[in-house]
């Protein structure tokens, strides 16, 4: 049990640092638009055109659970289909996973015990609402031995994601900036240690391609050790520019976990020498919808 509380070791290419201020901007693409002073933030546009109703969601459930209406709902559906179609075109197999997982699954991908207080739980049944499709999709391969010739395994999934986001407040969480329930398309890859970093680059290129097709200015950051997740060996964040808010919004994280998750979930493959070894797991958001919609509006 003590070993489950030990985080992953950072890759040698991870910058030293304690916070987001120490992250390294690797690339920035797209022209930053200049709006007039009368430009409205997305939450005002949503209210004016009645396409996302935050007050109604607050009435039904609480803050952070918006109701998408009319063209807002259609835009959500269109973006989800676009992201899934692009993933399939790039070799990812679509699956539709459960939105709840058991404790073993959450332990296997490292959400537990690290994110215990951040996940919505259903104690009566011993289930957790998923914070990302990474959890159920990666667990498809828990307790399996794959054949090397079948690697890489590439999967994509659309799901709603649920996060408590305890302690979040202020203008940075207004509107669609930070929600408790949101839509996201996730890409997951299982590969050999020899090829996993090639896959990482392909996944980064896939995410960049989506943002370029949406014509959104974006930048890629290599996260420092202090800003990475508990489970990651290396992570790249993608941020888009919100012209109305005049700031960058994170819309994707692409990570290589190396053998951290596979060791917890006993995900192995038989190599060319006949030896059974741990695989590398990778995943990325491709993409998370709320902030994409915020930037588009």
Cite the ranges covered by each PLM segment.
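N-terminal alpha-helical targeting/anchoring segments
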Residues: 1-33, 47, 51, 55
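TRNA-recognition modules of translation machinery and tRNA-sensing kinases, especially anticodon-binding
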Residues: 28-297
């Amino acid at each position: 049990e003590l070993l489950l509380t030990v985080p992953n070791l950072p890759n040698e290419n991870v910058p030293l640092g304690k916070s987001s201020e120490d992250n390294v901007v690797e690339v920035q693409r797209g022209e930053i638009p200049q709006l007039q002073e009368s430009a409205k933030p997305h939450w005002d546009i949503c209210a004016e055109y009645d396409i996302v109703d935050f007050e109604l969601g607050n009435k039904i459930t609480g803050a952070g659970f918006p109701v998408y209406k009319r063209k807002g709902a259609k835009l959500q559906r269109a973006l989800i289909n676009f992201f899934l179609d692009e993933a399939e075109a790039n070799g990812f197999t679509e699956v539709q996973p459960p939105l709840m997982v058991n404790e073993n699954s959450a332990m296997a991908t490292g959400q537990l015990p690290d994110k215990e207080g951040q996940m919505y739980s259903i104690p009566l049944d011993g289930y957790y609402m998923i914070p990302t499709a990474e959890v159920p999709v990666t667990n498809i391969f828990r307790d399996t031995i794959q054949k090397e010739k079948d690697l890489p395994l590439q999967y994509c999934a659309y799901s709603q994601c649920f996060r408590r986001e305890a302690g979040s407040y202020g203008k940075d969480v207004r509107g669609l900036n930070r929600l408790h329930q949101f839509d996201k398309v996730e890409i997951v890859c299982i590969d050999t240690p020899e090829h996993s970093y090639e896959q990482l680059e392909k996944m980064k290129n896939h995410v960049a391609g989506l943002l370029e097709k949406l014509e959104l200015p974006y930048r890629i950051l290599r996260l420092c050790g202090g800003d990475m997740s508990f489970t990651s060996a290396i992570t790249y964040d993608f941020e888009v520019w919100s012209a109305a808010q005049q700031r960058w919004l994170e819309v994707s994280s692409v990570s290589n976990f190396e053998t951290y998750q596979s060791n917890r979930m006993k995900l192995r493959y038989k190599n060319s020498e006949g030896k059974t070894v741990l695989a590398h797991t990778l995943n990325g958001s491709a993409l998370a919808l709320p902030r994409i919609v915020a930037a588009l509006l």
